[in-house]
UniProtKB/Swiss-Prot annotation:
This is Bifunctional UDP-N-acetylglucosamine 2-epimerase/N-acetylmannosamine kinase. Changing residue 157 to A: Loss UDP-N-acetylglucosamine 2-epimerase activity. No effect on N-acylmannosamine kinase activity. Strong reduction of the dimerization process. The keyword Kinase applies. The keyword Transport does not apply. The UDP-N-acetylglucosamine 2-epimerase activity, in contrast to the N-acetylmannosamine kinase activity, exhibits allosteric regulation by cytidine monophosphate-N-acetylneuraminic acid (CMP-Neu5Ac), the end product of neuraminic acid biosynthesis. Moreover, the activity is contingent upon the oligomeric state of the enzyme. The monomeric form is inactive, while the dimeric form selectively catalyzes the phosphorylation of N-acetylmannosamine. The hexameric form, on the other hand, demonstrates full proficiency in both enzyme activities. An N-acyl-D-mannosamine 6-phosphate binds at residues 416, 476-477, 489, 516-517, 545, 569, 588. UDP binds at residues 19, 23, 113, 220, 253, 282, 301-302, 307, 321. Changing residue 49 to A: Loss UDP-N-acetylglucosamine 2-epimerase activity. No effect on N-acylmannosamine kinase activity. Does not interfere with enzyme oligomerization. Keywords: Allosteric enzyme, ATP-binding, Cytoplasm, Hydrolase, Kinase, Magnesium, Metal-binding, Multifunctional enzyme, Nucleotide-binding, Phosphoprotein, Transferase, Zinc. Homodimer. Homotetramer. Homohexamer. The hexameric form exhibits both enzyme activities, whereas the dimeric form only catalyzes the phosphorylation of N-acyl-D-mannosamine. The active site is at 517. An N-acyl-D-mannosamine binds at residues 476-477, 489, 516-517, 566, 569, 588.
Length: 722
């Protein structure tokens, strides 16, 4: 209690609505109960817990030895959309009296259910602090809207995954009030060991059932497409009947459409079928043993994509209800579960497999983190929550200073040798540029980027430039959605799995975009260069390596794993020289600056490089420019090497033309002017006649990487899209 400055126990109200949220809240409740010196626990039970058709699951809370302070009957029967709305309204009518009586310091609310929305709304309007469990996640249904609405009402957030944490930050929630703890249920899942699991299996599925030889099915209605979800449930039952394995079917939740799903079960005689056991509720301790030892789980419950991964049990996820969730390799998605055969094939593929344990959603230590977080809450702090919005003008009316400001971006280019930061105007003018040697270690590099950006932002104020955001161009494979460098090039050391967005955004309080340098060059051409107004074009960068970017229908193509446009690694020869990627015969192995330097050194070592009018100082390394100079001065061998390099690049372009059929190819970088004529010749000789009319040009942009990085920021401000 000394930690938060409170001079009394923290009164915590945990409100639970159904069997699913109790499985997440129970570990926290047990943790609170073990620390009576710090906490007082009040338990409020409402929703489907109190309905007989759904198993009267409030009894399991009593069996766990929790005193239920209040039972609220809040469900309006009908199982349709109107009934859900009326249930929220009924809860809003009843909750104020309860909260006035309990007077909690903080209410813990879980997830994305309509009951939880009523709880959060009531607490927020009554100035009660709210701790929201599992915010920031994405499922792909109406639940997302409810979950994010609760996030906006909540004062504190406990999330389960790094992505969820980033989503909360993107939603402008206060970083200091977000805890990445993992899922509380994983504390139980990862320690769940029951030697007598066979007795649990026999109790629910019969004496003749073996471990890993049965299925658990749990499917809920999709409230935005009830008709389709009922049809999908019917197909699922038909497939399970045909698959002919013992199956435990749990009744659906109370959402709109659940009544129709139960009718489907009864129409098909599932409750009396010898291969099926239909149940309204299974206690969580027993349920985890059942899924842990099942041959497969099928349905669309979040339990399948979240909790079951802890055991490596195969899961078949049907439809779109969990389409946005992060999943382990144990999950097979059947998004268009529109035929019985498709579902049956999925059962044949998954049943009986065993996958590694997945810890995407937790490591088993969530509850201690949450209790520590609760203890840190200072009740003396103002209740009003703060949002971390990017800086914007407070006054929307125009004044002369606003009109005279230059809308600009901070652009960062992480090259193999140098680190550059520039202030770039909306017109593509580089107002000021800073250059430093790129450090070799991760810590030094991040520190230098932050230092240079802070200095540039301060200078921008003096130059009357309004910085709208930060764009970063870097070598390697980049996930632009998360702002993370996944894998770097060999030229940039210690640069794998690096989150660039968060430290810069936290320091500068500006939005940050990150992308691969080849993609940035293509975006620069689209906004400022010869690609402006072009629907389809390809940019090839010729420098130390070979990179590129593809614009298709005005949009940049990233590919399914952010690996599109690795054009330098198109193979143009089966027995060509080794490439830095580990393959051989790539364009980069012939036409990059590194490749030309390699050939220049060979010639120099054999005294075949220098011709009359040339010299290389002893302290100067032989490089590509010496090879080019020798070729210009008539060195036949140097000319042959350049011709081979240009031919390799040309063959790569031909492959691109035959694949993408762009109307324009832009060669960029220091070597572009030396290759342009050779590339055009190769196209005339090797390409199909239908693509030979393509325009192949040399870029006229001086700093495409910086301009492309800036364009990510400047495009966002004008188009208002990410």
């Amino acid at each position: 209690m000394e930690k938060n400055g409170n001079n009394r126990k923290l009164r915590v109200c945990v409100a639970t609505c159904n069997r699913a949220d109790y499985s997440k809240l129970a570990p926290i409740m047990f943790g609170i109960k073990t620390e009576p010196a710090f906490f007082e626990l009040d338990v409020v039970v409402l929703g489907s817990h109190l309905i007989d058709d759904y198993g009267n699951t409030y009894r399991m809370i009593e069996q766990d030895d929790f005193d239920i302070n209040t039972r609220l009957h809040t469900i309006v029967r009908g199982e349709d959309e109107a009934a859900m709305v009326e249930s929220v309204g009924l809860a809003l009518v009843k909750l104020p009296d309860v909260l006035n009586r309990l007077k909690p310091d903080i209410m813990i609310v879980h997830g994305d259910r309509f009951d939880a929305l009523a709880l959060a709304t009531s607490a927020a309007l009554m100035n009660i602090r709210i701790l929201h469990i599992e915010g920031g996640e994405v499922s792909g249904t109406i639940d997302d809207s409810i979950r994010h609405a609760i996030t906006k009402l909540a004062h504190y957030h406990v999330c389960c995954t790094r992505s969820a944490e980033q989503h909360l930050i993107s939603m402008c929630e206060d970083h200091d009030r977000i805890l990445l703890a993992g899922c509380p249920s994983y504390d139980k899942l990862l320690s769940a060991k029951n030697k007598d699991y066979m007795s649990i299996i026999r109790m629910w599925l019969g004496d003749d059932v073996k471990c890993k030889d049965y299925i658990v099915a749990l499917q809920h209605p999709v409230t935005t497409d009830i008709k389709h979800s009922i049809k999908m449930f019917e197909l699922t039952l038909d497939a399970l009947i045909s698959f002919n394995k013992r199956t435990l079917v749990l009744f659906p939740n109370i959402d709109a459409g659940s009544k129709e799903m139960v009718r489907v079960m009864r129409k098909k005689g599932i409750e009396h079928h010898p291969n099926f056991r239909a149940v309204k509720h299974v206690p969580f301790d027993q349920f985890i043993q059942l899924v842990a030892h099942a041959g497969c789980m099928i349905g669309n419950s979040s339990c399948g994509v979240r909790e079951v991964g802890a055991f490596g049990t195969p899961v078949i996820n049907l439809g779109t209800r969990q389409i946005g969730r992060e999943t382990g390799e144990n999950v097979l998605h059947v998004r268009d579960a529109d035929t019985q055969d498709k579902i049956l094939q999925a059962l044949h593929l998954q049943f009986g497999k065993q996958y590694p344990c997945s810890k995407i959603y937790g490591d088993g230590n969530a509850v201690p983190r949450i209790l520590k977080f609760l203890k840190s809450i200072d009740l003396q702090e103002p209740l009003q929550k703060k949002f971390c919005f990017p800086p914007v003008k407070e006054n929307i009316s125009q004044d002369i200073d606003h009109i005279l400001e230059t809308l600009s971006a901070l652009a960062v280019d992480l090259g193999g040798t140098n680190l550059r930061v520039a202030i770039v105007s909306m017109k593509g003018e580089i107002v000021k540029k800073y250059t430093q040697f790129n450090p070799k270690t991760y810590e030094e590099r991040i520190s230098l980027i932050l230092q240079m950006c802070v200095e540039a932002a301060a200078e921008a104020v003096k130059l009357n430039c309004r910085i709208l955001g930060v764009g970063i161009s870097t070598g390697g494979r980049v996930n632009p959605q998360e702002g993370v460098v996944l894998h770097s090039t060999k030229l940039i050391q210690e640069w794998n799995s690096v989150d660039l967005r968060t430290p810069l955004s936290d320091t500068l309080h500006l939005p940050v975009w990150v992308d691969n340098d080849g993609n940035c060059a293509a975006m620069a051409e689209r906004k400022f260069g010869q690609g402006k107004g072009q629907e389809n074009f390809v940019t090839l960068i010729t420098g130390t390596g070979i990179g590129g970017g593809i614009i298709h229908q005005h949009e940049l193509i990233h590919g399914s794993s952010f690996c599109a446009a690795e054009l330098g690694h198109l193979v143009v020869s089966l027995d060509g020289p080794d490439c830095s990627c580990g393959s051989h015969g790539c364009i980069e192995a012939y036409a990059s600056g590194m490749a030309l330097q390699r050939e220049a050194k060979k010639l120099h070592d054999e005294d075949l490089l220098l011709v009359e009018g040339m010299s290389v100082p002893k302290d100067e390394a032989v490089g590509a420019l010496h090879l080019i100079q020798a070729a210009k001065l008539g060195n036949v061998k140097a000319q042959s090497i350049l011709r081979t390099a240009g031919t390799a690049l040309g063959l790569g372009v031909v492959n691109i033309l035959h694949t993408m059929n762009p109307s324009l190819v832009i060669l960029s970088g220091v070597l572009a002017s030396h290759y342009i004529h050779i590339v055009r010749d190769v196209i005339r000789q090797q390409a199909l006649s239908s693509v030979q009319d393509v325009d192949v040009v040399v870029s006229d942009l001086v700093d495409p990487a910086l301009l492309g990085a800036a364009s990510m920021v400047l495009d966002y401000t004008t188009r208002r899209i990410h």
